Design a protein with these regions (language model features):
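Active-site proximal loop and beta-alpha junction motif in alpha/beta enzyme cores
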Residues: 1-193
Length: 193
């Protein structure tokens, strides 16, 4: 807080871990990691692209192709909870500096996140520490394709994976008030499986 305004927020994520490295998919090699969801990561240069708005249509097409090819494979299976299985998104990145990357996260049906994506940043942290690109105590910076920034670092580990903290800017978006009518038979939600 500064002058009564929130400057940034941070969250501690679920254990993050490397799923696989060097997986051939859609004509390139990707690394796959989990950080709350499973993501495929590749350098934008592997497609002859950069993480810039001008290349966004090609990045989206490449991300969707990767997701389609990997979906349903053993790589996309969460090792402990099948409900968490599936390639949630693909992330293309480019190195800006030793502890600084520019990323774009493509998810769902070709949607692009305005942020570097918290769960993807946590997964990327696991990959970077695993390959020695960053040290266990380093904080690294992820910029999104539109310039929003996260800072991430490892804060510990468990048998399930690396514990990470992701910090970014925050802006008030509104006030929300929810009501629960006691007569609503589905007011507390439902699950169909």
């Amino acid at each position: 807080m500064r002058a009564g305004e929130v400057q940034s927020v941070a969250f501690r994520n679920v254990p993050s871990f490397v799923v696989a490295r060097g997986v051939a998919a859609a004509g390139i090699e990707v690394d796959v990691a989990y950080g709350g969801a499973i993501y495929a990561f590749a350098p934008a240069s592997s497609r002859g692209l950069r993480v810039v708005p001008e290349d966004l249509p090609e990045l989206i097409a490449a991300g969707r192709a990767l997701q389609r090819e990997l979906e349903g494979t053993e790589i996309a299976r969460h090792p402990e909870d099948d409900r968490l299985s599936g390639i949630y998104g693909t992330v293309f990145y480019e190195q800006v500096g030793p502890l600084h990357q520019r990323t774009v996260a493509i998810f769902a049906d070709g949607e692009v996140d305005r942020s570097p994506t918290g769960s993807a940043t946590a997964a990327r942290t696991a990959l970077l520490i695993d390959d020695g690109s960053i040290g266990d105590t380093d904080t690294w910076r992820a910029d999104s394709i539109v310039g929003t920034t996260f800072h991430a670092r490892a804060i510990g580990s468990t048998p399930e994976g690396l514990l990470t903290e992701v910090q970014g800017t925050a802006f008030r978006t509104g006030r929300h008030r929810f009501y629960l009518d006691p007569r609503d038979p589905l007011g507390t939600g439902f699950v169909l499986r």
